[in-house]
């Protein structure tokens, strides 16, 4: 009797796991980003997308001029926001902060960033406070800064100093916790969005 109950329990568990797997497969979502480089086709540059269940199948959506390089971007309030810079092959110079309508591909410059003293490494949107955050390394003071950006004007304010380490990625949970990954070791850090402390 015990073996029979165990067998039925295992069969039930198997069907439950099977239904969860099938459900997970049907929940595929589109992920948008900015394609900076493609081994197969170096002419594809700009907004791209892929499915969560097929991340290796990247599809270009809206191509953009390769003279303007994106180094940070994030989706917020119905638009994709991107920080662009120019390069002469040796040096990178801040260029602009743009808003892109993903349904039409139309790009609108929000702010001219040519006077900005540093480049953003990444951006993320905090849905809990409706705030865009970015990280940038200021070479003049050897410090990574946590920056808040105004989506309407492009104006930036320093939220805090993270420290001397450089960071390459930034993310924010729906609850408002900011995270960054350092360049040197690939460690994930929790960032205080009010002080910048890691």
Question: Which stretches of residues belong to each language-model region?
Answer:
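Conserved beta-propeller blade signature
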Residues: 28-38, 79-84, 131-135, 177-180, ...
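A short beta-strand motif characteristic of beta-propeller blades
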Residues: 55-66, 106-114, 154-161, 197-198
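A short loop-to-beta-strand structural motif that recurs across blades of beta-propeller domains
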Residues: 45-48, 95-98, 144-147, 186-190
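Bacterial N-terminal signal peptides
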Residues: 9-19
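Repeated scaffold domains used in trafficking and secretory/extracellular systems
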Residues: 66-78, 115-128, 164-175
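Short glycine/acidic-enriched loop and turn motifs that connect beta-strands
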Residues: 37-43, 86-92, 138-142, 185-187
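Short loop/turn segments that connect beta-strands within beta-propeller blades
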Residues: 51-55, 100-105, 149-154, 192-197
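An edge-strand/N-cap motif at the start of beta-rich repeat modules
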Residues: 24-62, 73-75, 80
């Amino acid at each position: 009797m015990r073996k029979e109950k165990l067998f039925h329990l295992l069969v039930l568990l198997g069907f439950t796991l099977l239904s969860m797997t099938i459900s997970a497969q049907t929940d595929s979502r589109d992920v948008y980003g900015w394609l900076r480089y493609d081994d197969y086709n170096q002419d594809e540059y700009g907004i791209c997308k892929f499915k969560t269940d097929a991340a290796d199948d990247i599809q270009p959506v809206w191509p953009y001029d390769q003279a303007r390089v994106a180094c940070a971007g994030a989706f917020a309030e119905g638009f994709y926001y991107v920080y662009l810079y120019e390069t002469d092959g040796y040096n990178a110079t801040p260029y602009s902060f743009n808003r892109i309508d993903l349904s039409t591909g139309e790009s609108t410059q929000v702010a001219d960033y040519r006077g900005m003293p540093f480049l953003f490494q990444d951006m993320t949107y905090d849905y809990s406070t409706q705030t865009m955050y970015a990280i940038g390394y200021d070479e003049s003071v050897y410090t990574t800064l946590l920056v808040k950006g105004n989506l309407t004007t492009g104006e930036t304010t320093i939220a805090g100093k993270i420290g001397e380490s450089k960071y390459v990625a930034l993310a924010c949970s729906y609850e408002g916790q900011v995270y960054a990954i350092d360049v040197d070791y690939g460690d994930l850090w929790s960032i205080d969005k009010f002080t910048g402390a890691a």
